[in-house]
Amino acid sequence: MAKEKFERTKPHVNIGTIGHVDHGKTTLTAAITTVLAKKGLSELRSFDSIDNAPEEKERGITINTSHVEYETANRHYAHVDCPGHADYVKNMVTGAAQMDGAIIVCAATDGPMPQTREHILLARQVNVPRLVVFLNKCDMVDDEEMLELVEMEMRELLSFYDFDGDNTPIIQGSALGALNGVEKWEDKVMELMDAVDNWIPLPPRDVDKPFLMPVEDVFSITGRGTVATGRIESGIIHVGDEVEILGLGEDKKSVVTGVEMFRKLLDQGEAGDNVGLLLRGVDKNEIKRGMVLCKPGQIKPHSRFKAEVYILKKEEGGRHTPFHNKYRPQFYLRTMDCTGEITLPEGTEMVMPGDNVTITVELIYPVALNPGLRFAIREGGRTVGAGQITEIID
């Protein structure tokens, strides 16, 4: 029998489970797949298969992450779960696993704990738009008032970090109960998935955003002009479109006279395509790796920004010693690298390997930047940190 073709009929959303250690994130992930598997919407994944998360490398950092996929009646989900707290911090800050929304798991027996708070803060910093709360272990709490108290604390915590605490759905359940097939708790998992379907917004598709392509390589074709190659990050480009060439201090406009992919001529290229764009009236030495091509007026070069970063531990191949204010490493942004000076938050003397911190960066020249852009920090040929831009200063 022929293999079934993957039909992308439902919109795709990336989510994950976050929250304090031992509050039941992985158990809940297993419970979701188990309950949905009974309805034919998922492959059953055991706790052990999820907990035994494979190592992945992202921008030179090793992260343990489990990827699970399942469907609801309306959507297709890719769900990430991490075994350790440090893995979450790395995952969220480096964007190894982009989240369009998250389920924050909080044990009703404990209430919000330090990592509950830290994960909500991280979700805010890296612009996860909305969270859904799953109060776990409710089968172990007899006192209705206790549940109300924990729910109130969670709403206050969400509001404190600028989430919509008043309207965020909070589901009271038991992940273990659902995993063991107790109907009451299975229903709560379905209720949770309904909340996720309705509360977490569909992400804008990259194709619908304005055109942007970081330049990876440049060459000239005799008699035809200059070609810039790269992977289109967002948007669509048509033959005849005007583009802006930004970065490295030089800005210029041009018109795309040809779009090539795998040596074939196309009418257009779209987000995700690796293409070569033929540019009118551009000399080969006016454009180089690290610049970006974009729709005119969409993005400006900047040199100062705020960012949330994770600094690698010695064991991860990072620095052996802390760094101080005015540290000047290399920043790798898209396809370019540029020296930048780090300013630490007031009251922070130094940053230790293994820390995550909010920093201000001043690059030595302006480059095309936007909030949410991921980057690596390197020094002497090795990655010492990774992060993402949270705010452009100028």
From Swiss-Prot:
Region of interest: G1: 19-26
Would I find Nucleotide-binding among this entry's keywords?
A: yes
UniProt function note: GTP hydrolase that promotes the GTP-dependent binding of aminoacyl-tRNA to the A-site of ribosomes during protein biosynthesis.
Segments of this protein annotated with the region G5: 174-176
Instruction: List where in the cell it is found.
Output: Cytoplasm
Assembly notes: Monomer.
Residue ranges of region G3? 81-84
What InterPro entries does the database record attribute to this sequence? EF-Tu_GTP-bd, EF-Tu_GTPase, EFTu-like_2, EFTU_2, G_TR_CS, P-loop_NTPase, Small_GTP-bd, T_Tr_GTP-bd_dom
Q: Where does Mg(2+) bind?
A: 26
The protein's GO terms of the molecular function aspect are: GTP binding; GTPase activity; translation elongation factor activity
Q: Where is this region: G4?
A: 136-139
User: Where is it found, in Gene Ontology cellular component terms?
Assistant: cytoplasm
Catalytic activity reads: GTP + H2O = GDP + phosphate + H(+)
**GO biological process terms on file:** translational elongation
Gene3D superfamilies reported for this sequence: P-loop containing nucleotide triphosphate hydrolases (3.40.50.300), Translation factors (2.40.30.10)
Chain's gene name: tuf
Q: What is its main location?
A: cytoplasm
* Residues annotated as binding GTP: 19-26, 81-85, 136-139
The EC designation for this entry is 3.6.5.3
Protein family according to the UniProt entry: Belongs to the TRAFAC class translation factor GTPase superfamily. Classic translation factor GTPase family. EF-Tu/EF-1A subfamily.
The tr-type G domain extends over 10-205
What protein name is recorded for this chain? Elongation factor Tu
Q: Where is this region: G2?
A: 60-64
